[in-house]
Amino acid sequence: MCVYKSNSNNSNPSFIFERTVQEASSNDLFLQPPVSASNTSHSSRSNSFYNLQTISPIPISGSEVRTPSLRKNSNNVSSPLDNVIPTSRSASNSTTSSLAHQEYILNPICNMQNHHHRRRTLENSVAPALDASCSIVNDENTDLSDVDMVYSRRPSSAVSLNMALLARTNSATLPSSESSPASPDLKLSRSHSHSAATRPTLNNINNTGMTTTTSNGEPNSRILRFYSYVDMLNDEKLAQANNTPTSRPPMKSQAYSCPFILKRSPPQAYSSSSATTTFSNPFIKTTELPATSPYVSPQQSARQYSNNANNNAKSPKNRSSSILFQRQSILSNVDPVANMHKNPKFQIESSDSEEEDLTMDMLDPSFPLSSSLRSSANLASNPELATQTPLSTSSSYTAIGKPMPLSTDPSYVSSSNTLSSEHELRVEKVSEVLKKKVSNGGFSTEFNSCDT
């Protein structure tokens, strides 16, 4: 199949690749006046050399006479048209063209029609798609926005790319595709690749069918468009601005919406109670409970149990003080105002003397400064008043209305009067404190007998 293109003057049809060459050669050969014999060889050589340099090599029979002088002259011949139209043939074509030139010199008139026939035969080997593409590219009025690349019906790489990208859109987003006729060809439109109005979105992807369908149910041509990552982000921003849901969730919620991550997330998450009991600092206080809650936290109960075990292992005299510490911890949990001024206490243990342990156990900041000083001064001067003071202190506790979960024995309450604040000056002696503790514990008679 040969594709022709008419000239501007519509005189003679010419070939696309040899349009200018054929016009020049035909005019020179058929309109040339008769010349002398000496100039015939030079003129025919110049014309045939220009003609045959743009044509594929033509085989010549072996019976032809080949002389080295003619081959040498034909290589050195130059025509004025060589400066007008540049040739892109290699140097090897000059040798083959010289062989055809010798055949043309032997019979210039008879071989003219044979050259046309051979050129048409060679022209049939050119692909029609390449021929049409060259005609479109050479046209000055061609607009690239109106050019479509039409592929064959066989499975090509473009179809595989279309299946990989899943960029098949519905005609609802492409109003121009409704007017196009239905064809199975795959088209790549350059005009709509950069426009945001006809850009395909992820909501309109057809994952199953190879061809898209219009609103009327008719199959439409498959369209493959360039859809970059920037276009996807822009579509997501537009969807978020318009409050329209997208098929792909955002990056933050995608990690939580995946079922694989949801299956592994519970072992990695820790509850607040297990975290506080396992990795908590024992010297930092936890959040205070309300006044009506008698709950004791596990940290405080563990600390109280360890303090009681240490005190009871040292001497049996510290049992009352350990019970007082439990009572004070419960009262401190109930009264949040007193805990605001309370600092964390550290117990220093030593085996040299037992007096330091007793003084550390006597500290109680929950009582006022004046009442503790008054009670300590009265007990230091008159040890006999130790049995009378529990009445007033117990009445003061009942007036406040605080719960007493341990016991209502006056001996425990009376021993608490001997405790002083952290910020006051100690005026009592160790012997007096021991005498008071023993008398309150029921061993007053034995202690007095030992003194006498």
UniProtKB/Swiss-Prot annotation:
The modification Phosphoserine is found at residues 8, 11, 14, 56, 74, 79, 145, 156, 160, 171, 183, 189, 228, 257, 265, 297, 320, 353, 439. GO terms for biological process: establishment or maintenance of actin cytoskeleton polarity. The modification Phosphotyrosine is found at residues 227, 295. The modification Phosphothreonine is found at residues 121, 169, 173. GO terms for cellular component: cytoplasm; cytosol. Coiled coil: none annotated. The keyword Cytoplasm applies. Keywords: Cytoplasm, Phosphoprotein. Its main location: cytoplasm. Residues 201-216, 299-321, 365-383 have a biased composition (Low complexity). Residues 64-81, 171-182, 384-398 have a biased composition (Polar residues). To yeast VHS2. Disruption of the MLF3 gene causes increased sensitivity to the immunosuppressant leflunomide. This is Protein MLF3. It comes from Saccharomyces cerevisiae (strain ATCC 204508 / S288c) (Baker's yeast).
